[in-house]
A protein has these predicted regions:
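Membrane-proximal intracellular helices of multi-pass ion channels
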Residues: 1-172
């Protein structure tokens, strides 16, 4: 999606965009923190896309950061099943993942984890805003530090910047 956006908007060399997008997306998903291009200059859509990727993180068995794709997948199936139960109130719909039933206890723990993750994110972002940082830096700094991603978004902690220029209070 990001690659198609860059080709349409910039109309530059196809291969350069493909390599840059794939590298930066994998870097954000895996939490390695490397960047090849200043993706904050690609426009607003990539910033939102990378912010979402910071939250999602990698796969379940990896040591990457974020909520993890497995939990997001289970949450999606849970919401879908709840909507189906609203449409078909008498239906018995079990949540299945890889052809096996997901226990209610696991669903509850995943929803609790995601809820706490988002709550902590909003608390961190609010605290960073109180230190005098702008909105984009506060939001991306909270997401980046909570998800252990590395690069943030915005001018102060963008792809080719670091956290050294932030106020001391925000580093604690």
């Amino acid at each position: 999606v990001l690659f198609i956006y860059l080709v349409i908007v910039n109309r530059d060399i196809f291969e350069i965009h493909l390599r840059s997008v794939v590298f930066n997306v994998v870097s954000i998903l895996t939490g390695t923190g490397y960047v090849t291009k200043e993706f904050d200059q690609w426009g607003n859509f990539p910033l939102i896309f990378f912010l979402i990727l910071m939250f999602v993180g990698g796969c379940a068995g990896s040591t990457t950061c974020g909520i993890k794709i497995f939990r997001v997948h289970i949450l999606y199936y849970f919401i879908r099943n709840q909507l189906l139960k609203i449409i078909y109130p008498r239906a018995i719909i079990n949540l299945k993942y890889n052809n096996s039933k997901v226990e209610d206890k696991l669903i509850a723990s995943i929803i609790s984890f995601i809820y706490l993750y988002i709550l902590i994110f909003f608390v961190l972002a609010s605290m960073l805003t109180l230190t005098g940082l702008d909105f984009i830096t506060s939001i991306s700094g909270a997401a980046s530090s909570l998800s252990n991603v590395g690069p943030g978004l915005g001018g102060e902690i963008g792809p080719n910047s670091n956290y050294s220029g932030l106020p001391d209070q925000s580093k604690w």
